[in-house]
């Protein structure tokens, strides 16, 4: 399990990269300062799922439903965060209307498993249909995804207990926040009371090691890092998916978690580089659980699944 305590972790080095637990079933974890949980009060338990890539093949719908039921039974989360790429793919040039409709209908059916839970989603790069008949078509682009995911906007925020949550849209030029969104984020962080613990979620990693292996990270990472440094009393953790790899990185007292993929190797068995069945490289299919404490500390643990 990964725990972050403000201003106490690796002050000299500044950066630590997670290591794989030898069992292969635990979190990809770093070695933080030990804390007595008896002195901390848990504010929220949050499930983070990402890169579901739901579709008809590989019996994926039933497997996904079983995993969601497992999460509910085992962890009893307060709510769910969905990191994007919810459907198999709508972005390829050869995708047609019926395929998009079918994928979203499967998503709708699966997500009824969580009908008693709030699900806060962000948009992934495979969710939007760019080859709709025209830009005026109701299913073109991000607006349709916003509608299907039942979210208020392509980027938005909300608060729970004493924590604030910011959901970003990195689906812009070179994987970045557009200027309108960045200015909104600046104001959003500025208006928060001092020391408000804040979690941010983007589909794409902002910082971490997975980008070194497979790319796919925010091109505006330095700009965002500087903004987070300005609000270092608030920004505690940044979640992502996209790369289907599990990685925890600490930098400047912020915990960056790329939390693998529910679909692993897109619900398939894998390839020559897969470390095990269903793995993408060394990461098995899975999901993450976060413990968010009243004092602003964070624990993020990645749980492989075998569904």
Show which residues each predicted segment covers.
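Residue-level marker for buried hydrophobic side chains located in beta-strands
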Residues: 46-48, 81-82, 121, 200, ...
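Short acidic, glycine-rich surface-loop motifs adjacent to enzyme active sites
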Residues: 192-209
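Short, solvent-exposed aromatic-acidic interface loops
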Residues: 301-307
